[in-house]
Amino acid sequence: MADDNLLLYSSGLKKVLQMPARHENNPVIPNDKPWELAIGYCSVHRDPTTGEYACWYQSYAGNRAQDPTRRVTLCYATSKDGLTWTKPKLRLFDFNGDLDTNIVLVGNGGRSVNYGASVLFDPTDNQPGKRYKLAYWDFTENEGLQTPGLCVAFSPDGIRWKKHSKAPLLQGSYGEPTQPPFSNESDHLPAGRPAISDVMDLMWDPVNEQYCIYSKTWIDGPDGRRFWKRAVARTTSKDFINWSQPQLILSPNSREDHQFHGASIFYEGGLYLGLLQKLDLG
């Protein structure tokens, strides 16, 4: 719900929060492929010329995958109405030998958690090969260590992606370092804090003319304990390669609060609006 910033007069008006209704045929994109044990973290774009929708979503295969780079992948689907979706057989990446998949990006190897991907269509980029931009979380081997953090890729059509040669662009922190298989993560945590984590949402900020990533991060507890609760951090870039030190922008304020698992931000009508992901662990 927006505030009264754009209302000249409000006398006699009553604010009513419209409750969305779940579609009766949900899920409209079912996890019905061998590489889709579970799916989530979607980016949707509507082509203004054709009216067709494109959706990029994370697919988790886990131990079904014979190749570790296929444990978590980025998949692609299209729709004319946003309700009936088609998963094209792109034949770009196989899954356990089957090339008839809709996979458009695979992991880096190692721990290979190609996670929390977010896609942005950027029609103003004068390089056609970079009209589609992708930010995602993955591990990269550096000096014998599997270092997690921000990775990016570019595409002319949203289907054929080229990963940027440098990764990670920002080192991140996955989470609680005492939980296996991350028991040694505390040995090489990011120098700067807060650090990005494995949920990312991209936007183009037209006011400040910069790219923004709103990412899950971790905050310390009142007792100084690390990785106490999830919160939201923001990092910015003018060129999509060099990113600022993340800044904490939203965090839980009590032990009873839900955790903040991420936020999708967009600019509309002179306002920055956000959809907050709240995590309730019960």
Kindly label every feature range from the protein language model.
Residues 1-258, 266-282:
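Beta-rich carbohydrate-recognition and catalytic domains
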